[in-house]
Design a protein with these regions (language model features):
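Periplasmic-binding protein-like
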Residues: 66-67, 153, 180-193, 215-223, 262-287, 300-323
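C-terminal capping/gating helix-and-loop segments adjacent to ligand/active sites or protein-protein/ligand interfaces
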Residues: 307-368
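N-terminal secretory signal peptides
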Residues: 1-23, 27, 34
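Early extracytoplasmic/lumenal segment of secretory-pathway proteins
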Residues: 50-117
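Extracytoplasmic ligand-binding site segments that recognize negatively charged/polar headgroups
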Residues: 61-68, 104-242
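A bilobed periplasmic-binding-protein/Venus flytrap-type ligand-binding module shared by bacterial periplasmic
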Residues: 156-163, 199-204, 277-292, 297-299, ...
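N-terminal twin-arginine translocation
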Residues: 20-27, 36-50
């Protein structure tokens, strides 16, 4: 029994190495022959094993738990396939590295929609199969060739109610007005959301943001540089706020919900002019589960999954059919709720996919 299991595992690993180009055909044939198994049977067995489950590449923590309960259970009930996780974080460079190596181990990456714009045309992603996935179950412009928005998260801001009393900041112009609203601000150091906020503070309408006027945005950001701190993770900005290091902070709206609770309402979330960011699913080229991943993506679009992700993670549904079913207690925090949807601004993934690298570099130089 031990010998059979060893041969099975050895052949499965050899099949993966052969398909990834790390083993030549002659060596692979020799191993199969020595084991008394036909090459095609080994490859078929490897594919069958991969098709038993889908591997989601995300950021771990609560995200793993919530995606498992909100989507994984329904996906398994519908298809009989399981859901596993790689929680190492699908950074764009890591996706490129995985695909270029030929050793693709993930089926779907929890990413931003602009990653579909930058990675798809370079051959690093599979196209979305819209005969399975629905373009109608996301917002217009957010169903792209190589990625589809599943949820939305918003760049909003929180402020200290004790600092501003009965005259609180209400929009981005107030956030950038350090004379009327003195105090230290916290901005996202990777530029996204901060650039758009600066332009709206400088008088640009939300509908006229793109293409971003980088000089104008950076000048506005530099105007409050002496009153600003910069954060790179949700836990970092959360700590800044709850420890009263800042009076206001640009923040993801789901983190804002947590901060309101953790500070007993001392800090309040403002979703007016929140920048709606399309969180997306993208599929690395050559994903091991093949077409089965499209059923997983379609399951994530269904209303129960959308509402479950909102309840568990605070991520807002991108399926318009779910907007009217957002529970009353989630209305203040969900950016596509009836309370907020007319006040938000939409991110342009095409602009960020083509210009994001240069924009981030210019932003980092401006705040250094």
């Amino acid at each position: 029994m031990h010998d059979k299991q060893f041969k099975k595992e050895m052949l499965a690993e050899s099949a993966q190495a052969f398909k990834a180009g790390r083993m030549d055909r002659r060596t692979f044939l020799a191993l199969c022959g020595a084991s008394g198994v036909a090459m095609n049977a080994v490859l078929a067995g490897d594919a069958e094993a991969a098709a038993d489950h889908v591997v989601m590449w995300n950021w771990g923590g609560q995200s793993e738990e919530c995606h498992g309960s909100a989507i994984g259970e329904a996906f398994t009930a519908k298809t009989g396939k399981g859901l596993k996780f790689d929680t190492s974080g699908p950074l764009e460079g890591k996706i490129k590295e995985m695909v270029d190596s030929g050793n693709v181990t993930a089926d779907v990456a929890d990413a931003d929609l602009f990653n579909a714009v930058s990675l798809g045309p370079t051959g690093h992603l599979e196209p979305i199969d819209y005969s399975v996935v629905s373009k109608e179950k996301t917002l217009p412009g957010y169903a792209l060739e190589y990625g589809v928005s599943i949820i939305l998260y918003g760049y909003a801001f929180v402020y200290d109610t004790e600092a501003y009393g009965d005259n609180p900041p209400q929009n981005w112009a107030d956030f950038f007005d350090t004379e009327k609203f003195p105090g230290t601000r916290a901005l996202y150091k990777w530029a996204n959301g901060s650039l758009e906020a600066a332009l709206m503070a400088d008088g640009v309408a939300g509908s006229d943001l793109y293409p971003l006027d980088m000089d104008r945005a950076l000048n506005k950001i530099q105007s409050i540089k002496d009153d600003s701190l910069y954060w790179g993770s949700g836990s970092e900005v959360h700590s800044m706020v709850v420890n009263n290091e800042v009076s206001m902070a640009i923040i993801w709206q789901n983190r804002g919900r947590n901060i309101e609770n953790d500070t007993d309402g001392q800090y309040k979330l403002v979703n007016n002019q929140a920048m709606a960011m399309p969180g997306a699913y993208i599929v690395p080229k050559g994903n091991p589960a093949g077409a089965a991943v499209m059923d997983f993506i379609a399951t994530a679009q269904d209303i129960p999954a959308q509402l479950a992700l909102l309840d568990c993670l605070g991520m807002t549904p991108s399926n318009p059919e779910a907007f009217g079913q957002i529970p009353e207690d989630q209305q203040p925090y969900a950016i596509t709720s009836a309370m907020n949807i007319d006040k938000i601004v939409y991110n342009d993934p095409e602009w960020w996919g083509k210009n994001g690298g240069d924009a981030v570099n210019a932003f980092l130089e401006a705040i250094s």
